[in-house]
C-alpha cells in the first residue's frame, strides 16, 4: 500500500535555521539521530518567540516518525512522549494513522530490505548530496500485514530495543561514577600524595599505531576480518560496508572486545571497543599496558583529549592529527602501589560491567536486526519467535 494511506500527514521541516537560543524548545537536527533513536543530550534550542513560526507546517508529537531526506539518508526515529520542539533542516516527519498501522511496526519497516530498495529506487543522486524526492514519498509502498501481526512483530523488536536501552542507561550511570572517582582521586587534588610521582602517557601505556590495511587484504581462501577505522570506532561496530583484512596479520594488530582505542587523526576520540574482533587500521592507536588497568590509561588519555583536539585543529590543513611527541608531553599522576590497588578495586568492576553490557547490547542489536530481516521478509513465521 502507498505510505500516504497509512499516515495522517507527511511533512518536511523548514528550509532555514532559526537564531540560536540558550533555552526554549528543541530544534531537531540530523546530529540528534543516534542508532535509531533521538539523542537529546546535546541539542540546539529555538526561542519560545520563534517557535510558532517554525511549527506552522507541523508540530512533532509522540509516535510521529522523523527521518532524513537529504545528505545522510536512512536515519529514522520515533518522537518520544513529552517532546517539545520543531523539525530542523533536511528532516521530515510522517504521522502514522494508528487506526491503520502500528507506529512501531512502521518505524521498524523503515529498516527492512524492502524499504531500503524503495529508497534506492527513488533516490536522486545530486552533485553534492543524495536526497529523497519528498514529492514522490507519499507513493512509496509498504508491505503491510494485518494489525495483529504488526503488533506482534513490533512487540518483539521493541522488547530487544528496550533491553539495549536499559543497558545503555546503566552504562551511562556507571561511566559517570567512574569519571567522578577519577576526577576526585587524580584531577581535583591540591598536592601530590606521598609515594606518588609525575609521568606522561608513554610511561603508563603503549600506543600501537595500526596498519595501512590496503596492503593486507584477505588472501585466497581466507575469511577476512573487518577493519577498524574511525567510522567503525565512532559507531561502535563494524558493518557490511567495513573493509576487510587478512586474519594472518600480526596478532598485536587484531583488536578484541575491551581494547582501548584512540583515534589520533581526523576525529580525535578514545573509546573502549566492544564491536567484536577486527583489524587495527592506521590513524588509530591500540592503547595497552602490562602494568596498569584499562581504566587508568583510558581516563588519562581521555583527560588530555580536549588539548589534543586543540593541537590537531591548530595544525589542520586537510586532516588534523597529533604526533607521538604530544603523548610524551601529556602529564599523568602515577599513584603508589597501595593507592593504585585501592582505586583499582573500585574502578575495575565498573569497567568490567560496562564492557559486558556493551557486548550484550551489540549481540542484542545483532539478534534484533536478524529477526527484523526475517520477520519482514516472511522468512520465519511469527509463531516461531519468542524471547
What is each model feature region?
Residues 2-19, 31-65, 82, 88, ...:
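Sequence-specific dsDNA recognition surfaces
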Residues 69, 85-92, 104, 124-154, ...:
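A short glycine-rich beta-alpha junction/loop motif
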Residues 386-387:
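Amphipathic heptad-repeat alpha-helical coiled-coil/stalk segments that mediate oligomerization
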Residues 16-23, 42, 121-123, 197, ...:
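Short coil/turn segments at secondary-structure boundaries
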Residues 1-12, 139-212, 333, 337-383:
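Non-catalytic DNA-recognition/assembly elements of restriction-modification systems
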Residues 29-30, 48-112, 229, 249-306, ...:
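A short beta-sheet element
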Amino acid at each position: 500500500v502507498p505510505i500516504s494511506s497509512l499516515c495522517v500527514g507527511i511533512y518536511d521541516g523548514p528550509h532555514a535555521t532559526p537564531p540560536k537560543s540558550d533555552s526554549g524548545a528543541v530544534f531537531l537536527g540530523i546530529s540528534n539521530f543516534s542508532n535509531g533513536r533521538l539523542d537529546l543530550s546535546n541539542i540546539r534550542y529555538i526561542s519560545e518567540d520563534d517557535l510558532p513560526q517554525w511549527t506552522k507546517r507541523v508540530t512533532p508529537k509522540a509516535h510521529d516518525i522523523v527521518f532524513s531526506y537529504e545528505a545522510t539518508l536512512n536515519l529514522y526515529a520515533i518522537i518520544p512522549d513529552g517532546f517539545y520542539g520543531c523539525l530542523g533542516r533536511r528532516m521530515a516527519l510522517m504521522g502514522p494513522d494508528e487506526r491503520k498501522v502500528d507506529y512501531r511496526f512502521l518505524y521498524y519497516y523503515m529498516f527492512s530490505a524492502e524499504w531500503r530498495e524503495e529508497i534506492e529506487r527513488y533516490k536522486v543522486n545530486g552533485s553534492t548530496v543524495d536526497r529523497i524526492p519528498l514529492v514522490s514519498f507519499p507513493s512509496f509502498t509498504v508491505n503491510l500485514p494485518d494489525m495483529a501481526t504488526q503488533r506482534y512483530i513490533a512487540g518483539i523488536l521493541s522488547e530487544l530495543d528496550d533491553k539495549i536501552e536499559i543497558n545503555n542507561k546503566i552504562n551511562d550511570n556507571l561511566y559517570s561514577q567512574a569519571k567522578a572517582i577519577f576526577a576526585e582521586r587524580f584531577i581535583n587534588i591540591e598536592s601530590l600524595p606521598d609515594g606518588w610521582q609525575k609521568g606522561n602517557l608513554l610511561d603508563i601505556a603503549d600506543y600501537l599505531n595500526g596498519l595501512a590495511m590496503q596492503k593486507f587484504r584477505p588472501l585466497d581462501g581466507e575469511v577476512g576480518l573487518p577493519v577498524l577505522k574511525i567510522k567503525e570506532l565512532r559507531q561502535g561496530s563494524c558493518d557490511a560496508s567495513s573493509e576487510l583484512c587478512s586474519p594472518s596479520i600480526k596478532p598485536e594488530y587484531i583488536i578484541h572486545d575491551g581494547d582501548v582505542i584512540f583515534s589520533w587523526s581526523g576525529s580525535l576520540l578514545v573509546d573502549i571497543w566492544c564491536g567484536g574482533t577486527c583489524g587495527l587500521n592506521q590513524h588509530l592507536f591500540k592503547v595497552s599496558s602490562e602494568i596498569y588497568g584499562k581504566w587508568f590509561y583510558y581516563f588519562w588519555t581521555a583527560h588530555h583529549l580536549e588539548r589534543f583536539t586543540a593541537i590537531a585543529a591548530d595544525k589542520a590543513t586537510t586532516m588534523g592529527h597529533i604526533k607521538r611527541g604530544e603523548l610524551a608531553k601529556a602529564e599523568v599522576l602515577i599513584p603508589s602501589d597501595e593507592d593504585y590497588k585501592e582505586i583499582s578495586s573500585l574502578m575495575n568492576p565498573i569497567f568490567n560491567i560496562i564492557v559486558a553490557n556493551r557486548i550484550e547490547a551489540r549481540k542484542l542489536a545483532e539478534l534484533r536486526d536478524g529477526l527484523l530481516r526475517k520477520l519482514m521478509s516472511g522468512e520465519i513465521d511469527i509463531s516461531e519467535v519468542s524471547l
